[in-house]
UniProtKB/Swiss-Prot annotation:
Its main location: cytoplasm. This is Casein kinase I. It catalyses: L-seryl-[protein] + ATP = O-phospho-L-seryl-[protein] + ADP + H(+); L-threonyl-[protein] + ATP = O-phospho-L-threonyl-[protein] + ADP + H(+). The lineage of its organism: Eukaryota, Sar, Alveolata, Apicomplexa, Aconoidasida. It is an enzyme of class 2 (transferase). It comes from the Eukaryota. It is found in: Cytoplasm; Cytoplasmic vesicle, Secretory vesicle, Microneme; Secreted; Host cell surface. Its cofactor is Mg(2+). Interacts with rhoptry protein RON3; the interaction is direct. Interacts with CK2alpha; the interaction is direct. Interacts with nucleosome assembly protein NAPL. Interacts with RAB5b. Interacts with host GAPVD1. Interacts with host SNX22. Serine/threonine-protein kinase likely to be involved in many cellular processes. Phosphorylates rhoptry protein RON3, nucleosome assembly protein NAPL and DNA/RNA-binding protein ALBA4 in vitro.
Length: 324
């Protein structure tokens, strides 16, 4: 028996599960276009789909932000229909034998930083920056990296005055411990600096293949978090970035130097990574390590055909966000 959502979308195979519900693929019964559908039980103790749908509405229209087509309650489920995307960077990392080249890390970093800056420009911080929450697109958008999962996102400043909400301590860790900033481990209220620092750990994860605080033995969740924090604090940036270009040391030291209310200099960080790109003689051709493995010949052709369009979009995106 076919299950329909909003009498418009036919529910298909299950794509995955999270702590907050399940994700399915669905087809528009008229156009046959595919979408992603998130289902959350109306009996959930910690519902978040309503909150997340509101976030997507606020972020709507941003480059690399999925579009929501329908939200509502049917039967025992709260449902959200949104763009169907490709695999996550974590999936692609595994596909590439858990190591990305410097070129791929640099091209990936550029887009991820742009997505984070856009979220910040809308007065929110993500609070769960990790490879699983960045997905490539499909078809013509196969080279475009999208940011997803805003269930843990939080407003960090007043929308009108842009005054930061107050500094607090004694907070529980929100997000993924592997990539969490040191201040997050210390229980300090998160701000923009923490998303940027988390991205730095993601980039080193991609370059190294793993992080020094992975695989630690612990008897409880709290014990594990404590051990990750201790290892993270005791591992100097220079040791963490050993065998990586000095720009990554500069990046992380900059992140750790930011004060709670500081606006990160996204342009400086982009330029830092751009200088590395130029010095290494790379070409920004949108050919990632996973391109030959994942993309079809048709998709690869589209990537090359659309290179100039994406270059122009990225330039415009940077200008737009600097005006916020």
């Amino acid at each position: 028996m076919e299950i329909r959502v909003a009498n418009k979308y036919a529910l298909g195979k299950k794509l995955g599960s999270g702590s907050f519900g399940d994700i399915y693929v669905a087809k528009d019964i008229v156009t046959m276009e595919e979408f992603a559908v998130k289902l959350e039980s109306t009996r959930s103790k910690h519902p978040q789909l309503l909150y997340e749908s509101k976030l997507y509405k606020i972020l709507g229209g941003g480059i690399g932000v999925p579009k929501v087509y329908w939200y509502g309650i049917e039967g025992d489920f709260t449902i959200m229909v949104l763009d169907l995307l490709g695999p996550s960077l974590e999936d692609l990392f595994t596909l590439c034998n858990r190591k990305f080249s410097l070129k791929t890390v640099r091209m990936t970093a550029d887009q991820m930083l742009n997505r984070i800056e856009y979220v910040h420009s809308k007065n929110f911080i993500h609070r769960d920056i990790k490879p699983d929450n960045f997905l490539i697109g499909r078809g013509k958008k196969v080279t475009l990296i999208h940011i997803i999962d805003f269930g843990l996102a939080k407003k960090y400043r007043d929308s009108r005055s842009h005054t930061s909400y107050p500094y607090k301590e004694g907070k529980n860790l929100t997000g993924t411990a592997r990539y969490a900033s040191i201040n997050t481990h210390l229980g300090i209220e998160q701000s923009r600096r923490d998303d940027i620092e988390a991205l730095g750990y993601v980039l080193m994860y991609f370059l190294r293949g793993s992080l020094p605080w992975q695989g630690l033995k612990a008897i409880s969740k709290k014990d594990k978090y404590d051990k990750i924090m201790e290892k993270k604090i005791s591992t100097s940036v220079e040791v963490l970035c050993r065998n990586a270009s000095f720009e990554f040391v500069t990046y992380l030291n900059y992140c750790r130097s930011l004060r709670f209310e500081d606006r990160p200099d996204y342009t400086y960080l982009r330029r830092l990574l751009k200088d590395l790109f130029i010095r290494e003689g790379f070409t920004y051709d949108f050919l990632f390590d996973w391109t030959c493995v994942y993309a079809s010949e048709k998709d690869k052709k589209k990537m090359l055909e659309n290179k100039n369009r994406f270059d122009q979009t990225a330039d415009q995106e940077g200008r737009d966000q600097r005006n916020n």
